[in-house]
Design a protein with these regions (language model features):
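Short, structured active-site "lid" loops
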Residues: 42-61
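Small-molecule-sensing regulatory modules
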Residues: 1-43, 47, 67-80, 85-91, ...
């Protein structure tokens, strides 16, 4: 039976359970449950601390898991990213006191507080910068004011928390992270894991795209197909009205309204948008 690690708490937990449910897997209904056996799909799910998942997978105790890219890299575990899941996005950045200008080179000889010491140490080493990395498990942004560190490296979303702590971001992003599926490096992927990856990829794609249907005069079909090329090509069907055809194509969800406007402007009518709940491409 395939053994999969799932985050048991934090920002990744609910979204991980949601995508697994959409992919057809049973999930726990009680947050106190540590294990769920999905006999129908021949999978056991283990609910673990997100930071520990890469360790379990890398050691071979579990075949795969869902965790953050930042947590995988920080762990130095022998695990490999298989699939990005399009949620749990964050950026990992340096930040220093707002009362001076900072460059990454200024970190040399300084103290850097972070909850991701492995990731930060590896990044500084790649830049040939020598600095003391101070590990903290939380409230990293308070470390400068309390005199524990000179700068910090932390996950940033809006930056509001940093500004409230008197800090500002500097330098390029250290890492862009999101939720990912991982497996042990060099591990021969079993059939059950291939199915899970294929299902999750289908959900990710379904969330990313919508299905667009519209009618268009034949004379404008070429222009319309350039606007909605689809993944392979659009489906074109004849209509009872001889000078018109029906077109169906997948369109990126984020582009939906712009595409509808462009189609309307070239004479398309009956433009309909349908959500995609699952797919295999």
């Amino acid at each position: 039976m395939l053994r999969i690690a799932v985050p048991n708490k934090g920002s990744l937990a609910d979204a991980s359970i949601a995508i697994l449910k959409e992919a057809g897997y049973n999930q726990r209904s009680d947050s106190r449950d540590l294990i769920l056996v999905d006999s129908e799909n021949n999978v056991e799910f283990y609910y673990l601390r997100p930071r520990d998942i890469a360790i379990y997978v890398g050691s071979g105790e579990l075949e795969a898991g869902i965790t953050g890219r930042d947590l995988l890299i920080d762990s130095s575990a022998k695990a490999t990213e298989l699939l990005a899941l399009d949620f749990g996005g964050s950026t990992f950045r340096f930040a220093g006191p707002i009362d001076r200008e900072w460059a990454v080179s200024d970190i040399s000889g300084k103290r850097v507080a972070t909850a991701y010491p492995g990731l930060v140490a590896a990044h500084l080493s790649s830049l040939s910068i020598s600095a003391e990395v101070v590990r903290l498990d939380g409230a990293v942004e308070s470390s400068v004011r309390l005199g524990v560190a000179d700068v910090i490296a932390d996950v940033v979303s809006t930056g509001n928390t940093l500004r409230q702590a008197g800090l500002k971001i500097f330098g390029e992003a250290i890492l862009t992270s999101e939720a990912i599926v991982i497996s042990r490096t060099g591990f021969d992927i079993p059939a059950e894991l291939e199915v899970l990856i294929r299902r999750l990829q289908g959900v990710v794609t379904a969330r990313r795209y919508v299905l667009l249907d519209y009618d268009i005069p034949k004379i404008n079909v070429e222009t319309a197909c350039a606007i909605t090329p689809g993944l392979e090509s659009p489906t074109i069907s004849p209509l009872q009205k001889p000078d018109w055809v029906a077109v169906r194509a997948m369109v990126l969800r984020k582009d939906t309204n712009r595409v509808m406007d462009e189609l309307w402007n070239i004479g398309a009518r009956g433009i309909l948008v349908t959500d995609i709940h699952a797919c295999r491409l």
